[in-house]
Regions:
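A conserved acidic beta->alpha catalytic loop
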Residues: 20, 44-52, 68
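Short, acidic, metal-binding catalytic loop of nucleotide-sugar glycosyltransferases
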Residues: 28-37
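Short beta-strand/loop segment that forms part of the nucleotide-sugar
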Residues: 37-46, 64-66
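Glycine-rich, basic loop-to-helix element that forms the pyrophosphate-binding segment
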Residues: 66-86
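Acidic/His-rich active-site region of diverse nucleotide-sugar glycosyltransferases
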Residues: 74-77, 99, 104-186
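Short beta-strand-to-loop acidic/aromatic patch adjacent to the donor-nucleotide binding site
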Residues: 88-99
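A short, conserved alpha-helix in the catalytic core of glycosyltransferases
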Residues: 169-188, 192-220
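Non-catalytic, C-terminal membrane-associated alpha-helical segments of glycosyltransferases
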Residues: 235-240, 253-305
Length: 305
């Protein structure tokens, strides 16, 4: 399927949740982009006076305040609907704790316009506090085990020599460019996830509809994960366990035996992560994983933590 067509009108959405300083930095980086944005939309998941004062009166910004915390998927969907209503050909999703260099968006657009079946593009993600450390060069996903990995995560590479557009299973939602045709084909982000794994789930659903996800390896973004929820907080561990299982159920290999293997493998992985995670007490971290596993088994989704 050839999905190439010019992406003339671009919109960017920044999601804020109790991180006004980060949000301002994200907005500033988008304003400086070489590639012009037709719409810059801020969705505030927890109405913040500082953000409102700085952005609500700015004629170049659409500031939207939600009545409650809708999570990453729900908050972004509020902005995506507005962007599509205004005629955007592609929508850039940007988490508040991410920033983009001036050339990032142009590289992402070029990757989508030059790749026959591409509908989603992401940059190389680097740590904002340690810029030589790579956080992700796209994701790999194994449907049999349900395991996912961020390519090259944790490696130190001051410069990334590859300039290719690489097909991957998914890209991080912290900076993700999605064409209008993808949204029209598969809908918006799945709000069952609320927080965590919604990006990979969206990419895998898009693949079923014939769209490829790519990493534009010449593009870079900087991200400091977990700023709004806590990098290794029990709540983050809860969502990681529950949503990993949910994704594996929806995008795993068929068969009862494979499903049982995936459940055991994913639970073991999340328990191991809780054991080595810094901060808080080990019993609290393990309870968070157990809670997430139990809620998955009980069919609890969304913001049911």
């Amino acid at each position: 399927m050839d999905t190439r067509h010019p992406l003339a009108r671009l919109a960017a959405i920044v999601l804020n949740y109790r991180t006004p300083a980060d949000t301002m930095a994200a907005v500033a980086s988008l304003r400086a982009s070489q590639r012009r944005l037709d719409h810059l939309i801020i969705v505030d998941n927890d109405p913040d006076d500082e953000c409102r004062r700085a952005l609500a009166g700015d004629p170049a910004v659409t500031y939207l305040s939600t009545a409650q915390n809708l999570g990453f998927s729900g908050g972004m969907n509020v902005g995506i609907r507005i962007a599509l209503e205004r005629g955007a050909d592609a929508v850039l999703l940007v988490n508040s704790d991410a920033t983009v260099p001036t050339d990032c968006i142009a590289f992402l657009v070029d990757a989508l316009e030059s790749t026959a079946d591409a509908g989603i593009a992401g940059p190389v993600i680097r740590s904002r506090s340690q810029p030589d450390r790579i956080a992700s060069v796209g994701m790999t996903y194994a449907p049999r085990s349900g395991r996912m990995r961020h390519r090259l995560a944790g490696t130190r590479q001051p410069s990334f020599e590859s300039r290719s557009v690489r097909r991957v299973d998914g890209v991080s939602g912290c900076v993700m460019l999605v064409t209008r045709r993808v949204f029209e084909s598969i809908g918006l982000l799945e709000e069952d996830y609320f927080y965590s794994f919604e990006d990979l789930a969206f990419c895998l659903t898009a693949r079923r509809a014939g769209f490829t996800t790519v990493v534009a390896e010449m593009a870079t973004a900087y991200h400091e994960g977990g700023r709004s929820i806590g990098a290794e907080s029990p709540r983050r561990l809860y969502f990681a366990a529950r949503n990993h299982l949910l994704l594996a159920t929806r995008h795993g290999s068929p068969g009862a035996l494979a499903a049982r293997w995936r459940l055991l493998s994913i639970v073991a992985l999340n328990v191991a992560h809780a054991v080595i995670a810094p901060g808080g007490s080990l019993p609290t971290r393990l309870r968070a994983v157990a809670h997430g596993t139990r809620d998955y088994l009980n069919g609890s989704h969304g913001n049911d933590a």
